[in-house]
Regions:
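Nucleotide-activated donor-binding/catalytic signature segment of Leloir-type glycosyltransferases, i.e.
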Residues: 93-111
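Short alpha-helical donor nucleotide-sugar binding micro-motif in glycosyltransferases
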Residues: 110, 118-124
């Protein structure tokens, strides 16, 4: 966020106000996770990767699909679940078919039921979100509500608050980098659990907390204004 402001020429002071998340903190039960695996025919033990967002190329879905191809070619077992819809959905599906990864990638379409969506978050081993377009990676915080860590591009807005291997995982904006990170962490359940818990404790914020933070900041601005000579003017 700060880098985006600097790029357009803003050099003043700033305070970043975090977006809140409407999903509560939730630990999915083993039965919830088994339900998702049964629904999509995913055997127990195979790592589940997740993307949630609009089906648009600017979300770097090409990087995700190319990474899936690299993982398949290397012999890595996994399933990538892609949740969302959008005007480029058909083109994205055709590209996945062209890469011959239809046995590894599952397109669910849009999921409007927020409780169902949260079960997907909680079932996944990791969220894969290499978008550099988003000014705030809300899905990263949604995943954190279920203690699911995210892979994000270093120095992107989505990476704000992410420390590599502590509250998430950082990659370069390339399919090879994404594939390399996935392959390195997919079987390390202890690492995924620890980083997921850290994400929940450090980057998750509820809307109530976000509103309280914004309210306090506005109050500070109002108090500062009232303490200046401007308060002598009556409007």
């Amino acid at each position: 966020t700060v880098d985006s402001l600097r790029k357009v020429g803003y050099e003043g002071d700033y305070i970043v106000m975090p977006n809140g998340c409407d999903l509560p903190k939730l630990d999915c039960t083993e039965e919830m996770k088994a339900m998702i695996r049964r629904k999509h025919g995913i055997p127990e033990g195979i790592p589940i990767l997740l993307f949630v967002g609009r089906m648009m190329w600017y979300k770097n879905l090409r990087i995700i699909l190319d990474a899936c191809r690299l993982l398949k070619e290397s012999g890595r077992e996994y399933r990538m679940i892609i949740i969302g819809m959008g005007p480029e959905e058909n083109a994205i599906k055709k590209y996945a078919a062209k890469l011959n990864i239809g046995d590894k990638v599952i397109f669910t379409g849009q999921i409007l039921d927020r409780q169902e969506l949260q079960i997907y978050y909680g079932t996944a081993d990791m969220l894969v979100f290499p978008s550099t377009f988003d000014t705030n990676g809300l899905v990263v915080r949604e995943a954190a509500a279920s203690a699911t860590p995210a892979i994000v591009v270093a120095n992107s807005c989505a990476s704000e608050g992410i420390t590599d291997c502590e509250t998430g995982f950082l990659c370069l904006e390339s399919s090879r980098s994404v594939a390399k990170v996935i392959d390195r962490i997919a079987d390390n359940k202890d690492l995924l659990h620890r980083v997921g818990q850290n994400a929940r404790n450090n980057i998750y914020i509820s809307w109530d907390e976000s509103i309280a933070t914004a309210y306090n900041r506005y109050q500070t601005v109002i108090d500062k204004f009232n303490s200046t000579f401007h308060n002598k003017y009556k409007y």
